[in-house]
């Protein structure tokens, strides 16, 4: 094999995890190649996941804002848009993101190889190009960052024109008046917000007893109420018995005996790691039943020189976490170990309408652990900035230790929640006595701002102490 086909590290997949690893390794002086099976970089995050869904959400939330503001919708006039119409906005954002990320690799002289990779042996991969040709490449180390795809149960016909998953929904060409979303996880709830915001009748089937049960209960309840108030029908503790595609829609038969009918179905219940085409057996690796790889604290698989990051290793399955994992692996490969361990308190951003974000522990976790905590709350309806913007739905909640005043968890529901949370996260991550709720009382905030919610919540919480 020619020297030009040998690299220090080969990264498989150009999503956030692969990008983080490749950029860190290249800047560290390593000769790096990144292999991408699609025709452009960015991975599922850019093309089917985070970027398009958030671009859709933004467009829908602006339409809702316009239609609910009497300053704009005079004489009962309102804006109406369809899903297929606002998809064009999402596609323009995808194009911008793709060009931006392509530039990263070009500027850093990271070799880009387009094609589907699979292992031949422990240090060699074959890449099948779009024209059918196959090239082989070798490396000292590998980083698997192939991401995940929607889970397809065998008894659901995803070839039917009215049955979609969270990838294929972005190719929706007809404009449904009624949609059933099966699966009320993060993806299902985000799309429920989008479709209901477009005035599409939305039924959300939840296989659990509450929405997003990993959240603080109050936040989960707030989302449930907001969905109910906006007209989303939630069916908790339900599982399908049969999904029947018809000529003009779909019928979902539930095991409880209920039947539901709509113009189309979005199946959003679970994801599978993209490992089945990698020929992992040739290197002595085996994925679990969900296609995911097991890694150690350094993100090494059972084969020491092969690492894995991002959705392909499962939890937390966040683009932000995947990027950090990739950077961590780059440090581990370059220096033998990473200088800093990744923080365990990863913020969660859920882009429903309104947004949800949290970091740290929930009330139910603290109660179960018998931690003496107190709660500070700020309602957005009491903030001048929220009143000005007409975004007064939501609240911020700070959980802190009664005795040390250490911040233990922050939970936010409302406009810009995913941005607001980082102010609290920055203080939470301080060491020792620097992590204190009193910081927000002793700091001057710009006025009027949404960030002021931290001061209001801190005062509210401290006033509860005795």
Curated annotation (Swiss-Prot):
The keyword Flavoprotein applies. Coiled coil: none annotated. Its main location: cytoplasm. Binds 1 FAD per subunit. The keyword Chloroplast does not apply. GO terms for molecular function: dihydrolipoyl dehydrogenase (NADH) activity; flavin adenine dinucleotide binding; NAD(P)+ transhydrogenase (Si-specific) activity. It catalyses: NAD(+) + NADPH = NADH + NADP(+). One of its GO terms (biological process) is pyruvate metabolic process. GO terms for cellular component: cytosol. Keywords: Cytoplasm, FAD, Flavoprotein, NAD, NADP, Oxidoreductase. It is found in: Cytoplasm. FAD binds at residues 36-45. Its cofactor is FAD. Its EC number is 1.6.1.1. Conversion of NADPH, generated by peripheral catabolic pathways, to NADH, which can enter the respiratory chain for energy generation. Belongs to the class-I pyridine nucleotide-disulfide oxidoreductase family. This is Soluble pyridine nucleotide transhydrogenase.
